[in-house]
Amino acid sequence: MNSAKLIDHTLLKPESTRTQIDQIIDEAKAYNFKSVCVNPTHVKYAAERLDDSGVLVCTVIGFPLGASTTATKAFETEDAIQNGADEIDMVINIGALKDGRFDDVQQDIEAVVKAAKGHTVKVIIETVLLNHDEIVKASELTKAAGADFVKTSTGFAGGGATAEDVKLMKDTVGADVEVKASGGVRNLEDFNKMVEAGATRIGASAGVQIMQGLEADSDY
């Protein structure tokens, strides 16, 4: 297993500077991570710097609340891809899920999948805000909507991935959809637990520390 190619090297803090973006790009190139995951404002720059590097550009849509309109999420997706994004991590409408408005949740995801035009779409369900049945339902809706991954967390809601949630999500979606664990994966031990539970992608700001087998002190 090439552990580096499971990692989306992530910097999503609102105060992120160009210097910090340069740093994670340089690290991603050095370690040959799967992608760099940045906010949409940094996508074009990251795409230019990562051109022909083999490292993908991942960005986030409706982030971190998931509470923007479906049309807004679709436009954000189209704009991001036009600017060079390879992968899209979107946040579901969490309130709609809790209301039982499952058609709205699925249509929201479907609109982003359509706007992504074949690019990889990962669906963040924010597990820390959901109970067991809601995690199952959100995972089912993600699969039904045609997304590629179901993802645990934004890292902004006070909790992150757990091995138990990852396993539940993977058991729900089966072989057709992959699972991304993010939030609180800070070291090699955390990384291995998530992979053993069924994750095939890890979102973390601690990619370098994971590769070096060291502890990191970041929440995402």
From Swiss-Prot:
Keywords, in A-Z order: Cytoplasm, Lyase, Schiff base
Superkingdom, taxonomy of origin: Bacteria
UniProt GO cellular component terms: cytoplasm
Active site: D89 (proton donor/acceptor), K151 (schiff-base intermediate with acetaldehyde), K180 (proton donor/acceptor)
Principal location: cytoplasm
Subcellular localization(s) per the UniProt record: Cytoplasm
Pathway(s) per entry: Carbohydrate degradation; 2-deoxy-D-ribose 1-phosphate degradation; D-glyceraldehyde 3-phosphate and acetaldehyde from 2-deoxy-alpha-D-ribose 1-phosphate: step 2/2
Catalytic activity: 2-deoxy-D-ribose 5-phosphate = D-glyceraldehyde 3-phosphate + acetaldehyde
Enzyme class: lyase
BP GO annotations: 2-deoxyribose 1-phosphate catabolic process; carbohydrate catabolic process; deoxyribonucleotide catabolic process
Gene Ontology molecular functions: deoxyribose-phosphate aldolase activity
The enzyme's E.C. designation: 4.1.2.4
InterPro entries: Aldolase_TIM, DeoC, DeoC/FbaB/LacD_aldolase, DeoC_typeI
Job of this protein: Catalyzes a reversible aldol reaction between acetaldehyde and D-glyceraldehyde 3-phosphate to generate 2-deoxy-D-ribose 5-phosphate.
NCBIfam families per record: deoC
Family per record: Belongs to the DeoC/FbaB aldolase family. DeoC type 1 subfamily.
Protein name, as recorded: Deoxyribose-phosphate aldolase 2
Source organism (scientific name): Staphylococcus aureus (strain bovine RF122 / ET3-1)
GN (gene name): deoC2
